[in-house]
Design a protein with these regions (language model features):
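Positively charged n-region of N-terminal signal peptides that target proteins for export
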Residues: 1-5
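Ser/Thr-glycine-rich phosphate-binding loops at phosphate-binding pockets of nucleotides
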Residues: 194-199
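C-terminal motif of bacterial Sec signal peptides marking the signal peptidase cleavage site
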Residues: 14-18
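Cys-dependent protein tyrosine phosphatase-like superfamily
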Residues: 19-189, 201-301
Length: 301
């Protein structure tokens, strides 16, 4: 979706008054501090309160999560009433959306910005990634897959695929454009299926645009392991029982949670190719200095 289309869509939601929720003052980068109460929505949290330089991210405006498909009525009401949600950015594939469509939130637009569409459900589907993606509920089969070199290769480069694929970059560029166009005082929520990898990279690019340092970007990305601790530990336990080598356990984090190690490798690749993540934002996501300033003025205090 182009910048003009996003601007036209978002202009339709500016009719309601912006909310003025009390600002909570807490700097701690802890899962429980960032978690928001959205029953039925996995890994729901906000960026509000993060310290960037001598400023903080405003509370209750920037939300990230898993799919809204099973969001409760209470969650939908909170998104409308408390957060004054204006935008939902959905990074899932067409197949994921058709199997589990988001619930609608009144007065919010839902923008489809697919990341890894071709690899998961497109015409050039990557059978390796598809096998992993759609067999998440079969632990023994998953462990067997992890023994295969092609699976290991696909997993070890999965973050690179998210960042360096042209279509994925366009979706992230449109995501940042949508935040530039977001009405003042209104919230945005972005998600994929589980709110960890694709949502995590979208968050990383946003945090970088807001001026966050690398440690904050990595810490926020890593928080996604906490809501999925049980799933990670359960699969790791089964894997060890079935004799999976210790060095392959890291791949379980890529499947059930996130891998900070592989995340940082891709950040290193960005630095190597572009000099810095700021240069990547400018050269590949077409984020101008003026747009970056708009984001900082809008979301920092």
């Amino acid at each position: 979706m182009g910048k003009k289309a996003i601007l036209l869509l978002l202009s339709a939601v500016v009719l309601l008054a912006s909310c003025a929720n009390p600002q909570q003052r807490d700097n701690s980068l802890q899962c429980e501090k960032q978690t928001i109460d959205l029953p039925g929505v996995h890994n729901a949290r906000q960026l509000g309160g993060y310290v960037i330089g001598d400023k903080k991210i405003r509370m209750d405006l920037l939300l990230r999560s898993g799919t809204l498909a099973k969001a409760s009525d209470e969650a939908i009401s909170a998104l409308h009433d408390k957060y004054k949600l204006a935008l939902v950015a959905d990074f899932r594939s067409s197949m994921e959306r058709s199997k589990a469509p988001d619930r609608d939130v009144e007065d919010a637009i839902n923008v489809w910005l697919p990341v890894l569409e071709k690899k998961i459900s497109g015409e050039k589907v990557d059978t390796v990634m598809a096998a992993l993606h759609f067999n998440m509920d079969n632990p023994s089969y998953t462990v067997e897959l992890l023994r295969q070199q092609n699976i290991q290769d696909a997993l070890s480069t999965s973050y690179d695929a998210i960042v360096f694929d042209e279509d994925c970059r366009q979706s992230f560029a449109d995501f940042l454009d949508s935040l530039v166009a977001l009405p003042e005082g209104r919230a945005a929520l972005w998600h994929c299926s589980h709110g960890k990898d694709r949502s995590g990279w979208g968050t990383a690019f946003l945090l970088a645009a807001l001026g966050a340092d690398r440690s904050l970007i990595v810490d926020d990305f890593s928080i996604s392991n906490i809501p999925y601790t049980n799933e990670i530990e359960d699969l790791a336990s089964i894997a060890r029982e079935e004799g999976l080598e210790d060095e392959l356990i890291e791949y379980i984090y890529l499947l059930r949670g996130v891998s900070a190690a592989f995340f940082e490798k891709t950040l290193d690749a960005i630095d190597s190719c572009y000099g810095s993540i700021d240069n990547f934002l400018e050269q590949e996501l077409d984020l101008t200095a003026d747009e970056k300033q708009i984001l900082q003025d809008k979301f920092l205090e």
